A protein has these predicted regions:
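Conserved GTP-binding G-domain of TRAFAC-class P-loop NTPases and closely related GTPase folds
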Residues: 1-14, 19, 30-31, 99-161
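Short active-site oxyanion
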Residues: 10, 65, 91-93
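Conserved substrate/cofactor phosphate-moiety recognition/catalytic segment
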Residues: 14, 19-68, 73-76
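Short hydrophobic/aromatic-enriched beta-strand-loop microsegments
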Residues: 34-38, 89-91, 116
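Short, hinge-like loop/turn segments at secondary-structure boundaries
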Residues: 52-56, 85, 110-114
Length: 161
């Protein structure tokens, strides 16, 4: 239950670096979801996973909807998030950004400073990235793509997801 009496929710963003996840969060989710992202921690910080889980637990305990904006490429990454959300009675939606390696590398190349990820890191995530599904414990999976007009096209993931 959220602080305003609604059903608790968690959004887990899944996709490559520079896939549009953070922009999507700002444009579509920021008005009702608390943001948790390892990108907000100092680059060399230790214990990022534990820190992230603490922030998730705090938000859920306070009854706030929470969005986790990381690459979240595998069940090992999203499994603990799903468990925490369900333990608090929250529904969990995966926001799946299908991989476009060339597009992510182009967008990443335009980033500056610490926001730019080495190409080898983007490629490593691409190799391990797995499409999330309801069989992984998600209550729903939606697919997010660029709409070609500067926005996003969001629709339920095709069957089998």
């Amino acid at each position: 239950m959220t602080a305003d009496g609604g059903a608790a929710e968690m959004a887990v963003l899944v996709g490559l670096q520079a896939a549009g996840k953070s922009t999507f969060y700002r444009r579509r989710l920021a008005h009702r979801y608390t943001l948790v992202s390892k990108d907000l921690f100092p680059r060399r910080a230790r214990g990022k996973q534990a820190r992230q889980m603490r922030q998730v637990e705090e938000a859920l305990t306070a009854g706030r909807a929470v969005a986790v904006d990381n690459t979240n490429p595998t069940p090992e990454e999203w499994g603990p998030l799903i468990e925490a959300a369900h333990a608090h009675g929250a529904t969990v939606t995966a926001y799946w950004f299908p991989p476009d390696l060339a597009g992510s590398l182009r967008r990443n190349a335009r980033r500056e400073g610490a926001a730019r990820v080495p190409d080898v890191g983007v490629r490593a995530t691409f190799r391990k990235l797995r499409r999330p599904g309801t069989g992984d414990g998600f209550d729903a999976v939606v697919e997010v793509r660029f709409d070609g007009r500067g926005g996003f096209d969001v629709r339920p993931a095709p069957p089998g997801a």
